């Protein structure tokens, strides 16, 4: 399986949600790509949740369908200019984590089926809308990992935080 195929991306999306929700998987260790993604996206997600708390508090994620609707609206705005880059792709994962936490905050118990549904539509979006760009830019292992693994944490953090703040500020027009 190549790193631009749906199954690979879906695995990254599922691994990220397990990381965000602190779900331990006995006997399985995330790939290097998954670990780098978790580090970068969770840093961005944490900062966004802290700095944009008031904005995020204004929207309710009460179902997977609501999460999908919000996700599609935000991604449509995020990519309407046709520009794809690694920072924007990281924001997709950070937003996946935010939506999932909002949804599970409304539920009595964690429902892994809901998480699987969210990781599915996130992976579907990434594969369909950024897959070709990812392939042209070295793929996950030779593009993404090389870009984010060797950079200073602050430079990466500032680059990606700017993108996700821009995206989430767009939520204000919907909620």
Swiss-Prot record:
Cross-referenced SMART domains: BCL (SM00337)
InterPro entries referenced in this protein's UniProt entry, alphabetically: Bcl-2-like_sf (IPR036834), Bcl-2_BH1-3 (IPR046371), Bcl-2_fam (IPR026298), Bcl2-like (IPR002475), Bcl2_BH1_motif_CS (IPR020717), Bcl2_BH2_motif_CS (IPR020726), Bcl2A1 (IPR013282)
Keyword Cytoplasm annotated: yes
GO CC annotations on file: cytoplasm; mitochondrial outer membrane
Cellular location(s): Cytoplasm
Keyword vocabulary terms for this entry: Apoptosis, Cytoplasm
GO annotation (BP), single: extrinsic apoptotic signaling pathway in absence of ligand
Pfam families associated with the record: Bcl-2 (PF00452)
GO MF annotation list: channel activity
Role: Retards apoptosis induced by IL-3 deprivation. May function in the response of hemopoietic cells to external signals and in maintaining endothelial survival during infection. Can inhibit apoptosis induced by serum starvation in the mammary epithelial cell line HC11.
Stated family: Belongs to the Bcl-2 family.
Subunit field text: Interacts directly with BCL2L11/BIM, BAK1, BID, BMF and BBC3. Interacts directly with PMAIP1. Interacts with BOP. Interacts with ING4. Interacts with UBQLN4.
Protein known as: Bcl-2-related protein A1
Organism: Bos taurus (Bovine)
């Amino acid at each position: 399986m190549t790193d631009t195929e749906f199954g690979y991306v879906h695995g990254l999306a599922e691994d990220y949600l397990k990381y965000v929700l602190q779900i331990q998987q006995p006997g399985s260790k995330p790939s290097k790509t998954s670990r780098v993604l978790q580090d970068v996206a969770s840093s961005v997600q944490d900062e966004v949740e802290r700095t944009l708390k008031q904005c995020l508090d204004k929207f309710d994620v009460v179902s997977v369908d609501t999460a999908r609707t919000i996700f599609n609206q935000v991604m449509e705005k995020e990519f309407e200019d046709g520009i794809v880059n690694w920072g924007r792709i990281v924001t997709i994962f950070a937003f996946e984590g935010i939506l999932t936490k909002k949804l599970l905050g409304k539920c009595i118990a964690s429902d892994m089926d809901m998480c699987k549904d969210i990781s599915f539509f996130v992976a579907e979006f990434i594969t369909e809308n950024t897959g070709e760009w990812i392939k042209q830019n070295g793929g996950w292992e030779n593009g993404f990992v090389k870009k984010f693994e060797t950079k200073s944490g602050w430079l990466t953090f500032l680059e990606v935080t700017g993108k996700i703040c821009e995206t989430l500020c767009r939520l204000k027009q919907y909620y």
